[in-house]
Amino acid sequence: MEPPQCVEELEDDVFQSEDGEPGTQPGGLLSADLFAQSQLDCPLSRLQLFPLTHCCGPGLRPISQEDKATQTLSPASPSQGVMLPCGVTEEPQRLFYGNAGYRLPLPASFPAGSPLGEQPPEGQFLQHRAEVQIARKLQCIADQFHRLHTQQHQQNRDRAWWQVFLFLQNLALNRQENREGVGPW
């Protein structure tokens, strides 16, 4: 059994800019020529598994393409049309106001010499962002593989129980024939 060719058919929203448009830089990291865009038509999603959008989230797709089946309109802002996950009735509160966030301890990997307001170079930001998105996509693929493996394991276990059941039924119903050795052999 050969592995499914799901990776080639995935929608490559990893290499799109934030506004959902494919990159226009020729030869750059966000170039649309690197990967062909296709619909989300993965063979794994046909096996009664969740489609990729359920485990990866909407990604960087435009709002019109987001899956709104798991979202509800927020009662706090019906005029703005803000979508919230099912079961959430209010928008999240801001954790910090003003400059209170600057008082948090810095992670050990943070460079000590750079000021807090300084932005990293744009190329480094795009590279980091693409790496994070690739990692999320790989995690999503791994989750689907795990679900498929678990489903196949469950089917094999069910098949084994049916074989045991049919064997016992054959023994119980055909006791005399089994004792005499009557059969196709």
From Swiss-Prot:
It comes from the Eukaryota. Residues 1-28 are annotated as: Disordered. Widely expressed with an abundant expression in pancreas, liver kidney and hematopoietic tissues. GO terms for cellular component: actin cytoskeleton; cytoplasm; myosin complex. A motif (BH3) lies at residues 134-148. Residues 67-75 are annotated as: Interaction with DLC2. Residues 8-21 have a biased composition (Acidic residues). One of its GO terms (biological process) is negative regulation of apoptotic signaling pathway. It holds the Pfam family BMF. Keywords: Apoptosis. May play a role in apoptosis. Interacts with MCL1, BCL2, BCL2L1/BCL-Xl, BCL2A1 and BCL2L2/BCL-w. Interacts with the myosin V actin motor complex through its binding to DLC2. Belongs to the Bcl-2 family. PANTHER family: BCL-2-MODIFYING FACTOR. This is Bcl-2-modifying factor. It comes from Mus musculus. The lineage of its organism: Eukaryota, Metazoa, Chordata, Craniata, Vertebrata.
